[in-house]
């Protein structure tokens, strides 16, 4: 073999399976270098071949065969280079197609955004109006007929409840009468207690207040609050719930006359078996209900107080006369005048005095009918000075007031 055959570089073939860009580039660079070396070595080989041909004809034939082999190798390398480039382009095309498919949604989104931004304000406004018309609920107009039907329905509901309350009260009365006659303690009146939650739920609704009062449901409330045939009061839960509901209802005088509820509430204010909390609530209801009857105002400023002039001399004379009368009574009865004071003693205080022991003071309630008339003249507002010397004026007014009071006490 010739030196050209020995020194011929090996071409690195790239398989179609190798799809990486770095390996393809390295093979292309190696082929370019090999071609350059082959081109530089061709003149030397031709010169050697001519010299050998002159020396030996057989060597000339060998050189020609070596040149033909080199040309065939170069053509094969060029064909491999073309094959490598085509393989590279096929892989790239597949990747580019995949990337184009993934980028299509983003391009479409951008195009839709551009169309939305390019839309005119008028078209956008029309679209918003259409959406508003679709989403907006139609207004339901109530007619007079619907209102009448609603009132009629509420009236029927209250009347049904009234009948149920009357039936429950009558069943409890019958149960108690049978218990009294037979002496069977197992008979318990529970009908009103079972119906109580329904009654409280209706009475506590503010929108049904007028319907309750107009349909005289207070009459059934009165029947529930009345004492039972054996003299006992209804259960505490019934009393508490019904009084709380009555406190929230706007009861008027005509409703009290029609239902007769006022007499039962007065009974609860006077009975000693009623709880203190319920008794106070009953007194509050009576005060509110009787105020419009007697024409009294609930405003304290409108309250009229009877006034009388206070005469200290007259009071002193009266106290002296009362003390003299008490001494005469004590002397006639033979008791020690010092054992009892000028005031009238109670039985407890008299018993303590007989045992020569001190009596605990008893709580007394004083109720005044008349208020004393104020005899102090109003101090003018301009009498008080502001600034330097204001304290002097205050002290002078204080002296005047004290001197006037001292004169009256004398």
Curated annotation (Swiss-Prot):
Chief location category: nucleus
Record keyword Nucleus present: yes
Keywords: Nucleus, Phosphoprotein, Transcription, Transcription regulation
Cellular localisation: Nucleus
Residue positions, PTM Phosphothreonine: 15, 86
Keyword check for Transmembrane: no
Renumbered residue ranges of the record's region Disordered: 1-132, 318-346
GO terms for biological process, alphabetical: nucleosome assembly; poly(A)+ mRNA export from nucleus; regulation of transcription by RNA polymerase II; regulation of transcription elongation by RNA polymerase II
Modified residue annotations for Phosphoserine: 23, 40, 85, 89
Record note on what altering residue 192 to N does: Suppresses postrecruitment-defective SPT15/TBP alleles
PROSITE patterns, per database record: TFIIS_N
Family: Belongs to the IWS1 family.
Summary of the function given for this chain in its UniProt record: Transcription factor involved in RNA polymerase II transcription regulation. May function in both SPT15/TBP post-recruitment and recruitment steps of transcription.
Remaining remarks: Present with 2830 molecules/cell in log phase SD medium.
Name of the protein in question: Transcription factor SPN1
Primary gene name: SPN1
């Amino acid at each position: 073999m010739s030196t050209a055959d020995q020194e011929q570089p090996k071409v690195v073939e790239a398989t179609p399976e190798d799809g990486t860009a770095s390996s393809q580039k390295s093979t292309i660079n190696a082929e370019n270098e090999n071609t350059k070396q082959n081109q530089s070595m061709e003149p030397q080989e031709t010169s050697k071949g001519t010299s050998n041909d002159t020396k030996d004809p057989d060597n000339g034939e060998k050189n020609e065969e070596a040149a033909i082999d080199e040309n065939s190798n170069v053509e094969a390398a060029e064909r491999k280079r073309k094959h490598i480039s085509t393989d590279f382009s096929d892989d790239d095309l597949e990747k580019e197609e995949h990337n184009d498919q993934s980028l299509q949604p983003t391009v479409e989104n951008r195009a839709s955004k551009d169309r939305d931004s390019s839309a005119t304000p008028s078209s956008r406004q029309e679209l918003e109006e259409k959406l508003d018309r679709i989403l907006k609920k139609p207004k339901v107009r109530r007619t007079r007929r619907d209102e009448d039907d609603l009132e009629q329905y509420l009236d029927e509901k209250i009347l049904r409840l009234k009948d149920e309350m009357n039936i429950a009260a009558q069943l409890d009365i019958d149960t108690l009468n049978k218990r009294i006659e037979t002496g069977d303690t197992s008979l318990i009146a529970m009908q009103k207690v079972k119906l109580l939650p329904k009654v409280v739920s209706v009475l506590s609704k503010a929108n049904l207040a007028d319907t309750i009062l107009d349909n005289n449901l207070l009459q059934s409330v009165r029947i529930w609050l009345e004492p039972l045939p054996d003299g006992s009061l209804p259960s505490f839960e019934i009393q508490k719930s019904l009084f709380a509901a009555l406190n929230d209802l706007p009861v008027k005088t005509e409703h009290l006359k029609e239902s007769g509820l006022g007499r039962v509430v007065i009974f609860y204010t006077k009975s000693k078996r009623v709880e203190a909390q319920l008794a106070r609530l009953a007194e509050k209801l009576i005060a509110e209900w009787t105020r419009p009857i007697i024409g009294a105002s609930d405003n304290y400023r409108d309250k009229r107080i009877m006034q009388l002039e206070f005469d200290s001399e007259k009071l002193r004379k009266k106290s002296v006369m009362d003390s003299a009368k008490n001494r005469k009574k004590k002397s006639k009865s033979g008791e020690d005048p010092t054992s009892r004071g000028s005031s009238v003693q109670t039985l407890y205080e008299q018993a303590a005095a007989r045992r020569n022991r001190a009596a605990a003071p008893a709580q007394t309630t004083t109720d005044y009918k008349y208020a004393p008339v104020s005899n102090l003249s109003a101090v003018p507002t301009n009498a008080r000075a502001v600034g330097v010397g204001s304290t002097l004026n205050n002290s002078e007014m204080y002296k005047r007031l004290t001197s006037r009071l001292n004169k009256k006490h004398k």
